[in-house]
Regions:
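Short helix-perturbing small/polar motifs within transmembrane alpha-helices
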Residues: 2-37, 74-78, 94-145, 178
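Short, contiguous, pocket-lining structural segments
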Residues: 26, 30, 51, 169-172
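Alpha-helical membrane segments and adjacent membrane-interface helices in multi-pass membrane proteins
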Residues: 37-110
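Membrane-embedded alpha-helical hairpins and interfacial helices in multi-pass inner-membrane proteins
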Residues: 92-94, 115-194
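Context-gated lysine
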Residues: 2, 22, 44, 70, ...
């Protein structure tokens, strides 16, 4: 039979062990999200020579599938880094809500879709976000340029070819969403609880 002191010692060890595990998990996530945020912004910079073709939509969806609500951390670390790198000019402001829109849509997708369905749905959603980018960006542009309704529609029409390129690029790069999210989930499960 154990004495009351032995039970208290075991409880203390258990509390300390749980606290260490939580701190370890927090440090792991902090480092991981900083690296993923840096990769998010670096991918945009690296792909600058290709107009409107980048990994931001793909990474937003991958991070959301893998980390759910916590995906906002690396996404907005990356958005902040893009602002620090290129300056916090007016183009940067819509990035703050454009990523949030795609994150929200991804959060609304069922989590337990069959693999074959995911392989179609994820690239299509990513692509639709690219096709709609100009229309989603337009209200902000109209606001800062003082455009009326007609001016905003003309602005959207003028950028339509770039939105088409953006949507096609997002679809092509969106084909990476399923394998990357599976990789992230597998690696996170393997290394996060050590």
């Amino acid at each position: 039979m154990k004495s009351p002191t032995q039970n208290n010692d075991q409880n203390d060890v258990s509390v300390v062990s749980n606290r260490r595990r939580k701190i370890s998990q927090l440090i792991f996530e902090l480092v991981l999200f900083a690296i993923l945020g840096a990769f998010f912004s670096a991918s945009k910079i690296i792909m600058e020579p290709f107009p409107n073709i980048h990994l931001l939509g793909t990474l937003t969806m991958v991070y959301t599938i893998a980390f759910r609500y916590k995906a906002l951390i690396p996404i907005y670390v990356g958005v902040l880094q893009m602002g620090l790198y290129a300056g916090f000019s007016p183009w940067w402001v819509p990035h703050r809500y454009m990523c949030l829109i795609l994150w929200g849509i991804t959060m609304l997708l069922p989590r337990r879709m069959p693999h074959a369905v995911c392989c179609v749905v994820y690239p299509v959603v990513c692509s639709l976000h690219g096709f709609a980018y100009g229309a989603l960006y337009a209200p902000f542009q109209a606001l800062i340029d003082g455009l009326g309704w007609e001016g905003m529609l003309l602005w959207i029409a003028a950028g339509l070819k770039f939105d088409i390129l953006h949507g096609v690029g997002n679809f092509a790069l969106g084909l990476l969403i399923v394998p990357l999210s599976e990789l992230f989930l597998r690696l996170t499960r393997k290394y996060s609880h050590r």
